[in-house]
């Protein structure tokens, strides 16, 4: 509701003041207003949002402040601190200037209305000219203050987004958060919460500073005019705040529930979109319709309760807003009638009264925004603590943990007398020692005391019934699961530099270069066909990196390949596509640099062949294949295995088809573990040479690309 106020009650200088305040309110409550249709913007002192702060927040202010400081402080001590502090100082300087301009307008208004009441046309013309000049000179300060604040907020958000993303993607933290359900919606925290935090923190800080200076300046003016009016203001503002909080406390849970229920409804719609084909095959449209309507009805019913509660609160707030327009006039009117003050002083007292009331009622006016901001601080504080500690305990509280290491073979048999590295014809690639693997959720044992070695040119097939732990074993090899005990050791290329110790990050980089995992459903990145092929080994945007391999700003590139491995050329990529029978898709989709939703436009079989193309380009020492040919026919499956075997890649496969045995020389057979027994539930056996790929290399059959 926008109140239209006559000039004696809300003069132009006061409207300028209130338009500035409303911009602050817009910044502070921006994200909440998008979600809550009951949040309205009104002019002057007519905004009284519904409270939505949890009742127990008062007792947690100290904790909230600590979280706020922990989240906010890194930027102000970062490499961008000089620019940040300079811009912040400029914002505060402009805030002081705008407060001074508002005080000047207050006195201009007094003289302006005095000349009008005295019917002094010459003085009125002069004061009108002063007013127009003051507007022309004052408005740029208000605009520049808001612009400087918004650019600082954008700069802060950019830095924080990169800061949190680096920590989120480090050491597989993102996977641990998702797989163990430690916190909800990390993506929302990285996007919505970070955006809201930076904008609201600056806006609220600016509003507090502005309100403090404003309160001091106009309290002196109001107290000079009529001290009892200052007392009336205190009683009115504190009383209104208390009543509003009391009447609006029922809105707290309703607002939070509304956000959750609407999010649930949106998520249901996203699931329909992502699983459209499966739903269509099942003919499950009616079931989906019922589920969607059920969630919509839940949100609708809660919103109805929210509207009723808001209506009840507005019975008070509307009266509060209207009464404020005549209350100061009613208090000082007897002084005007007795001749103790001029008419312009009435306008001055109304202006000062509205300024001070706005400052005293700041908590009331920003109640809903403050509650939303406190929720943002809670969520980001929780997220920040999680990323800082980087400690993920298994819910089963397993004491033992699988030891996963990456090292190089370094012994006397590997070195000549002059210290150079000997050529090793059968290098060990993987060693598993006494591995007992358990699920991270409830500690159920999947594999008992597994020991196995995989050497160069070995091809191991892991088989077993569904749920026996085949894929879980690969998760343990990838470092995704640590529940259990035992040791897994990957042996890197012996050509690495032994003279330098490797950090954890360097070891992980080495692991990424030497071991590549192919899941059953390959991950299709957002980008071009070229990026699909280069992922995850090389960056697709070389021009954005320095010769040393880092980004221009000094950070590591998103996709890393060890030095000495040249990035494939366009011809290399096309030849590799031909090797996996996908030479036609570049023409089909407009070239290597065309961008599509690849997980939708390519069939699962084509995606699996594309994953094998990545494997051939990366040339890892060891490949872990989790049913990576499940969507392919036997001819294509055989052809792809022949390609990677010819490339000299050692691989470990998981599969159910007996036809896979001919592509391997060893089989690890896993049976379902007996929870009451500690006996091993696995065996390793050799595959008959004549059934293996070694005996079939001369019988190659090239399948069709269709």
Swiss-Prot record:
Family: Belongs to the ABC transporter superfamily. ABCD family. Peroxisomal fatty acyl CoA transporter (TC 3.A.1.203) subfamily.
Top-level EC class as recorded in UniProt: translocase
Residue ranges occupied by any ABC transporter domain in the UniProt entry: 430-697
PROSITE patterns: ABC_TM1F, ABC_TRANSPORTER_1, ABC_TRANSPORTER_2
Subcellular location: Membrane; Plastid, Chloroplast
Membrane topology reported for the UniProt record: Multi-pass membrane protein
Residue stretches making up the ABC transmembrane type-1 domain: 88-372
List of residues binding ATP: 464-471
Gene name per UniProt: ABCC2
E.C. number(s) listed in UniProt: 7.-.-.-
Listed GO MF terms: ABC-type transporter activity; ATP binding; ATP hydrolysis activity
Gene3D superfamilies attached to this UniProt entry: ABC transporter type 1, transmembrane domain, P-loop containing nucleotide triphosphate hydrolases
Superkingdom in the source lineage: Eukaryota
Protein's name according to its UniProt entry: ABC transporter D family member 2, chloroplastic
Modified residues (N-acetylserine): 45
Keywords associated with the record: Acetylation, ATP-binding, Chloroplast, Membrane, Nucleotide-binding, Plastid, Transit peptide, Translocase, Transmembrane, Transmembrane helix, Transport
Transit peptide: 1-44
Stretches with biased composition (Basic and acidic residues): 560-569
Membrane spanning residue stretches: 88-108, 124-144, 200-222, 237-257, 326-346
Region named Disordered: 545-569
Paired cysteines (S-S): none
Pfam family, one: ABC_tran
